Amino acid sequence: VVGRVRRLTGAAKVGHAGTLDPMATGVLTMALGEATKTVSYLMDGAKAYRFTVRWGEQRDTDDAEGTIVETSDVRPTRDQILAVLGNFIGDIEQVPPVFSAIKIEGKRAYALARADQAPEMKPRTIHIEDLKLLSVVDADHAEFEAVSGKGAYMRSLARDLGTALGTVGHIAQLRRIAVGPFDEKQAISLDKLESLRHSAPLSEHLLPVETVLDDIPALALTEIEARKLRRGQAVPVLPVANRSPFKNIRQDDVVCAMAEGRLVALAKIKGGEIRPFRVMNF
């Protein structure tokens, strides 16, 4: 996807905020040019998914593309499903799928698994902000919606839901419907992007880099202050803060340094100064 977007846009630098599973569809947030400097903020942001669990079959990949390794005749009822959802909300321990991009001693877990050297995956703490049952499609399938933090796997969630319900299960369908402030309404398909390059400026379909940083306080700079930050120099925070509606900025806070409505730099408040650590070269 990165290569195709680079070719279609002509951008020298292209980044993305989190991979999608091979069988997954939905939102993949792309950053072009200087916006790649903000990708880490999207990576740490919330992601929303809609997925269908197929009960009664466990697969080695925890999705429909894998080989069946265990079956069960148990099919949970709607009430049983609703009763366990609360156990999966908040900070929970989750074992990632063996077929994942996590590195184990320098090698991807999926590469080891394909070479019949499946590694032991260690549990890690992840955060599930919300988990809802949308519908019981039939005895074998249930549809869910989840909002998660960084590092959560819906395939593992489906597997663990099955275990909690006394059966087994895997992801039959998976769609990412939002990443941070971006959702499907703002998304554009690769095919449409291909067609637009011949008919309209792509810039009309790009969102400003500030969209990613909408939850970070913004400080308005004068042109002199902006020039200093662009050169990597710090500026005193007090005059800037006095012009800002944000009166509770603290030591080590990250701020967006702005000039004339454009992002100049991401900066930290240190020792009474605004110190840039990501300067934008627009």
Task: Identify the role of each PLM range.
Residues V1-H16, L20, L85, A164-F282:
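Accessory RNA 3′-end/elbow-binding domains used by RNA modification enzymes
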Residues V1-S156, D160-I188, K192, L266-A267:
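RNA pseudouridine synthases
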